[in-house]
Amino acid sequence: MQYFSKKKLVLPEGYFVNSSQIPLAKEVNKLLANCGCETFPIKALNEAIKKSNFFFTIQNELKNKLYGFVRVTSDRALNANVWNLSALPGNNQKLYYSILLQVTLEKINREMPGCSISVQAPVSSFVSLEENGFILDPNGIRVMGYKL
């Protein structure tokens, strides 16, 4: 199913979405921790970001700080996986999540049409995920196997 955004969301003045400058893994870990998410060894996280198909950050022109982050991996045929969705807690957290989801889904739709999308995300993002068309599964992904 293709994604079409209902309305264009706007960041507060001075904030922007960046997809060209790789964020410092230390800063991503700080953001993940603030969201109550698991953090990762710096070297492993840095490699994961570099090997991702793409990523987006939300930053401020005046402050050297991350306000949001998401990265995507995909086989470009069947699956697109959204990882490390995180947004700084506060008044704009829901807006940051929604903007990250909007730009991510637009890019997946454009570059990876037909891929099913799986998301690894914190509880604080659930409202934004639902508002962007995701169906939350309270039981999560279940492993399937076939015994030979």
Regions found by a protein language model. Name each.
Residues 108-121:
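Conserved GNAT acetyl-CoA-binding A-motif
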Residues 38-62, 66-86:
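A conserved beta-strand-loop-helix scaffold within acyl/acetyltransferase catalytic domains
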Residues 84-95:
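A short, internal acetyl-CoA/4′-phosphopantetheine-binding micro-motif in the GNAT/acyltransferase core
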Residues 93-107:
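Conserved acetyl-CoA-binding loop-helix of GNAT-fold acetyltransferases
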Residues 1-43, 140-143:
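Short amphipathic alpha-helix that is part of the acyltransferase structural core
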Residues 135-148:
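Conserved catalytic-core motifs of GNAT/GCN5-like acyltransferases
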